[in-house]
Amino acid sequence: MKHTIYIAGPMRGKENNNETAFHNAEKRLNRRGFTVINPLNIGRSIASDEIIAGNADLLKTVMKIERMLIRHCDAIYLLEGWKESDGVKAELVTAIGFDCMIFLESEDIEARQEKEHKNGRTPWDHDGAETPGAGVHS
């Protein structure tokens, strides 16, 4: 079963809106078999200059669209620097609310999947024993 993962990371204040990190993450996740939702591919880049310039109404609209996309994902993938981004924090809260798995860019997803598989689980098994996003706060 192919799982859908949403990439979340800081954009404002980053060189080229952090495009390189988003696209590298997309390639890496595609190679691991995920269906990837990269917000840069969904029109956010079209409006990014206005968002960076401070168009609050447009930013709110984009965030609503992103929250709707996260609802349809199994996981969220947090790029480095996510803790400094209020937008990413909001996306994370949304993902936790929809019981998405949380992966960090610094995390070895394959190793995590193998470890959980050996324990008779997958990262997608939720039995209420673990809190989604546990360990994200480190």
Named regions from a protein language model:
Residues M1-S138:
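Conserved catalytic or regulatory cores that recognize and/or transform ribose-phosphate-containing ligands
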